[in-house]
Amino acid sequence: MRLTEIEFTEAKPVEGYGPGFFRIGGEVYEGATLVLPTGVTVWGGFDDTEALIAAAKSIDVLFVGMGVEIAPVPAAFRSAIEAAGPGVETMASPTACRTYNVLLSEGRRVGLALLPV
């Protein structure tokens, strides 16, 4: 079996997570976190859509990690993001991290909004 190391260009992969934190691109972020092609930042939750709407033209899908278990996102949040362009996919945060990394490694245009586990 041939193993090849994945190289990420500008976007940063999720390298790990734990209770209340995410390790992304070699840095640790505590609490809710937003990962976009433009960078990684603290996320204010579902009322904080400004950065997501601003990045809408640079992503095709936004993965929303809902914490330990999957749960629906608020309808107003989903509507605001989808009106700006990208699709919204919800899942548990660990699953969202893995899915984001796989699609990022394929060169896809993805974003990630995470609630901590």
Indicate where each model-derived feature is located.
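Short glycine-/small-residue-rich flexible loop motifs, especially phosphate/cofactor-binding loops
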Residues: 19, 75-78, 100
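Non-catalytic interface/targeting segments
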Residues: 1-46, 105-117
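C-terminal structural segments of small proteins and small subunits
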Residues: 83-115
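Short active-site-adjacent helix-start/loop capping segments
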Residues: 42-44, 70-73, 98-99
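Mid-chain, well-packed structural core segment of small domains
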Residues: 56-91
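Compact, glycine-rich, soluble single-domain proteins
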Residues: 34-59, 65, 92
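Short, low-complexity, polar/charged sequence segments that are solvent-exposed and flexible
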Residues: 41, 51-56, 81-84, 107-110
